[in-house]
């Protein structure tokens, strides 16, 4: 039966080797298939020309390589690309962002999100389910195969991965870690740990697990300089407070691929963008002795939000204060906002929880009609 076949797409190198041993085949054949899938983009066993006929026949009986369907894709004038990907009747978004010298793919880990951060549009649609490892790595497979390498002006090679799309990746640890293993495998995409970044809102126990089992680069969605405000806008803080979070971050900085943690801080007008907030943030990070780089993200408004984007003057003032106090600070440029691909807009084409499937099916029907 089709449903009994193993989808090889989501198996990291060890898992695919174990599968081949279980069907009486050698590990080196597993590595051949692994390379065909991820390095060469081939998903037809018959096209894997260095495999024997009998092995290809056995694989067709016992395994499959299933790639989710791309419902539609969009390209922004600034080179940003976005895909809406079918994951079994629901949909997730993947975004490719061009910047000087690199191409970053923003990968989703869940359909929706459980954390319900007050300023994030993804959380407003509710939570459906975790993505499988195959559905996570498929986003990179699709991007690597469908992006043109160059348009004469831009290089569309994926050089960096950020697990910053829809969902909280550490709430889907068991599937995200094997997918990241594939991203970093030299027989697959060959990205270094420094080029794969996982962003978390602060699932503290899993930060320790991540350091032990993967050790990719870590970014933390902080967004507030104290527990009172963070409890309000990042509710997981009620379970794992700032002290616990920064303790985990300090250890990760000591042992991870970078000697600092990137803290993401979404600037929301008159909520967390006051000079007093900047002062408190500086005092917090210095007192905890966490090596930090700060990435300021101007809030991206979406329909129904009560929040506003700060003025450029307020953003500049906040940044200047942090820099004056010794912190490397960047302001994230808004990219892809004309196709709802900017940070915080990843629910634009994916629907609220109650209407998700109906609207998805309508989108699918409209796409097929075209």
UniProtKB/Swiss-Prot annotation:
Record bears the keyword 4Fe-4S = yes
Tell me where it mainly resides. cytoplasm
Q: Where does S-adenosyl-L-methionine bind?
A: 167-168, 199, 221-223, 300
Q: Which GO terms describe its molecular function?
A: 4 iron, 4 sulfur cluster binding; metal ion binding; rRNA (adenine(2503)-C2-)-methyltransferase activity; rRNA binding; tRNA (adenine(37)-C2)-methyltransferase activity; tRNA binding
Report if keyword Manganese is assigned: no
Q: Which GO terms describe its cellular component?
A: cytoplasm
Cited function? Specifically methylates position 2 of adenine 2503 in 23S rRNA and position 2 of adenine 37 in tRNAs. m2A2503 modification seems to play a crucial role in the proofreading step occurring at the peptidyl transferase center and thus would serve to optimize ribosomal fidelity.
Its family remark reads: Belongs to the radical SAM superfamily. RlmN family.
Q: What is this protein called?
A: Dual-specificity RNA methyltransferase RlmN
Q: Which organism is it from?
A: Francisella tularensis subsp. tularensis (strain SCHU S4 / Schu 4)
Q: What broad taxonomic lineage does this protein's source fall under? A: Bacteria, Pseudomonadati, Pseudomonadota, Gammaproteobacteria, Thiotrichales
């Amino acid at each position: 039966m089709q449903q009994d076949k193993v989808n090889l797409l989501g198996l990291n190198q060890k898992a695919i080797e174990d599968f081949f041993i279980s069907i009486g085949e050698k590990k080196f054949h597993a590595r051949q298939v692994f390379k065909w899938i991820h390095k060469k983009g081939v998903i037809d066993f018959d096209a894997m020309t260095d495999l024997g006929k009998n092995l290809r026949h056995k694989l067709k009986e016992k395994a499959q390589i299933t790639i989710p369907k791309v419902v539609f894709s969009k390209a922004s004038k600034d080179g940003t690309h976005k895909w809406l990907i079918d994951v079994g009747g629901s949909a997730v978004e993947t975004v490719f962002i061009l910047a000087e010298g690199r191409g970053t793919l923003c990968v989703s880990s869940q359909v929706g999100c459980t954390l319900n951060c007050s300023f994030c549009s993804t959380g407003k649609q509710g939570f459906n389910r975790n993505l499988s490892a195959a559905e996570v790595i498929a986003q990179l497979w699709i991007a690597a195969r469908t992006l043109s390498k160059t348009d004469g002006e831009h290089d569309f090679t994926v050089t960096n991965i950020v697990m910053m799309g829809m969902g909280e990746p550490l709430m889907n640890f068991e599937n995200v870690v094997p997918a990241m293993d594939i991203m970093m495998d030299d027989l697959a995409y060959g990205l270094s740990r420094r080029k794969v970044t996982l962003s978390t809102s602060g699932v503290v126990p899993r930060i320790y697990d991540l350091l032990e089992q993967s050790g990719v680069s870590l970014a933390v969605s902080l967004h507030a300089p104290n527990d009172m405000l963070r409890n309000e806008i990042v509710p997981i803080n009620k379970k794992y407070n700032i002290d616990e979070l920064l303790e985990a971050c300090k250890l990760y900085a000591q042992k991870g691929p970078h000697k600092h943690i990137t803290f993401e801080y979404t600037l929301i007008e008159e909520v967390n963008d006051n000079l007093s907030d900047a002062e408190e943030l500086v005092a917090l990070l210095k007192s905890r002795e966490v090596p930090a780089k700060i990435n300021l993200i101007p809030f991206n408004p979406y329909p129904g939000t009560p929040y506003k984007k700060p003025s450029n003057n307020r953003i500049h003032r906040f940044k200047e204060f942090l820099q004056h106090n010794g912190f490397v600070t960047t302001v994230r440029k808004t990219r892809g906002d004309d196709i709802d691909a900017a940070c915080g807009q990843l629910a634009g084409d994916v629907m609220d929880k109650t209407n998700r499937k109906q609207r998805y099916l309508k989108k699918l029907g409209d796409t097929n009609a075209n």
